[in-house]
Amino acid sequence: MQRIPIIPSIMALIISACASTPSIWGVPETPTPNGAILYPPPYDPFTVNDSQIIFPTSTTPPEIATQLAYTPTSTPVDMPPLIQPTFTPSLDTAPFLYYAQSGDMLPAIASRFSADESEITSDADLTKTTLIDPGTLLVIPNRVTEPTTPNVQIMPDAEVIFSKTAIDFDVGKYVKDQNGYLSHFREYLGSTGWVTGPDAVERLAIENSINPRLILGLLEYESRWVRGQPIDALHTDYPMGFNDYHFKGMSVQLVWALNNMSIAYYGWRAGTLNYLDFPDGTRLRIDPRLNAGTVAIQYLFSRLHSQSQWSQIINPDTGFPAVYKQMFGDIWARADAANPIFPPALNQPTLLLPFEPNTAWNLTGGPHNAWGQLNPEIYGVSHSVYAAIDFAPSTDHGGCDPTTLWVTAAAPGLVVRAENGVVMVDLDGDGYEQTGWDIMYMHIAAIGRVPKGTWVEANDRIGHASCEGGVSTGTHLHFARKYNGEWVTADGPIPFIMSGWRVVAGAKAYEGKLVRGDETVIADPVGQKWSNIIRGEDE
């Protein structure tokens, strides 16, 4: 059996760098737009009280390597009061009556509420391993005895992910109409050359599957790039306020912000994130009743600001939510048109292994991040969403050598994107990546790649696996699913099944296996024999 001669120590880098985090090679001078500056709104979100709010905690949070990119000022007399955390004083309080939200699953809910799964009761059947239908009433013992964030939802899930709400939004037109700094901004990226600000925002939204409105809202709130001018020299180079020279420039600043939001959004979905750790050394538990979108916003700002400043930033009347509403209108009404993200009884459509029968491939990566390079020295020991797996064609050479083997369509659909190493196939055929099931084939070579607009049937040729798109040290296919704009975890309540093979996650990223009956294929970065898989003629 042929193997892939790739050094294990470097193979682990193959997909963790799939986000194609570009280098900033230079930023040209940007002309100052004519006319009055459109910002600020009737309040200054950066004028906050820096006095630390101390809450009791028995845990000493780890040091977060980030600096504040602002100068705190005193609080004006008429400053709105801080949103105070809620607190459950004892174990003898009434149980929570919690209505399940879209994307909820029992293990994650149990983790958020510090309860055992067996303690959670409902009239619905909770023995199933599927997602819980939205609106299902759950009775949960009150085990939360720490201060928590406010139980105030400030951002719907549909406004965080690249959902249906993003279909009719024109980034370029909106930015041009605002006539702020971003409308005239350009930067040089190693992966694309010169790119305009709006084009960079749009590409980041599509590739990271994040709502472009949210990207603009964050950029405006932290630096005023969208409707006016940067608030100071620091925010010109570090518009998201993350003061680290490795992240100098708009695109890499936004990549940092989007990665943090994804860590929180999908960590909340999975039940692996329950606390916020602030740069001032304080820690706060996340209220278990919040939705993933709200947690994503709370988490991002907790990485940038002290707890007292954060409390004012998340204030729905005077903080970031107010700025966002001023920019984009009623977010909840817009989200209602896209909800629920995951409808009841959702199942994956039938998928085939994404390569031709009787050809030798290897499972070189178990479940890992769908998109994004998450360096633990920057982001901590966290992960976003383990939605992707890797297949590599068997080869005698390894590295980025071309392959003659074909990646094939796992299901019929419309090719809605074919660029930068990515082929995205829309299975419902409506032409929108933001709706229904979508399958991502990543690292597809430009030569022989199926063009955008093509309808493919199952088994039709997509292209050849390669190292194109992102950072890769070996020819392979990075394969992932999305539904309604949200990455779907590979080993979760909607299992990733191809030709009867089910994906099972390992203890760490890239570990795992495929299981079909009594057959097992174990992921191995160098393609050893236990990772070999050959699709049968009748599969």
Residue ranges and their predicted role:
Residues 19-28, 35-37, 68-99, 108, ...:
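Extracellular LysM carbohydrate-binding repeats and other cell-envelope/extracellular binding modules
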Residues 349-351, 397, 401, 408, ...:
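Acidic, glycine-rich catalytic/binding loops that coordinate metals and/or anionic ligands
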Residues 343-346, 362-409:
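Short glycine/threonine/proline-enriched tight-turn/helix- or strand-capping micro-motif at secondary-structure
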Residues 100, 105-123, 135, 205, ...:
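Short alpha-helical segments in extracytoplasmic peptidoglycan/chitin-binding modules
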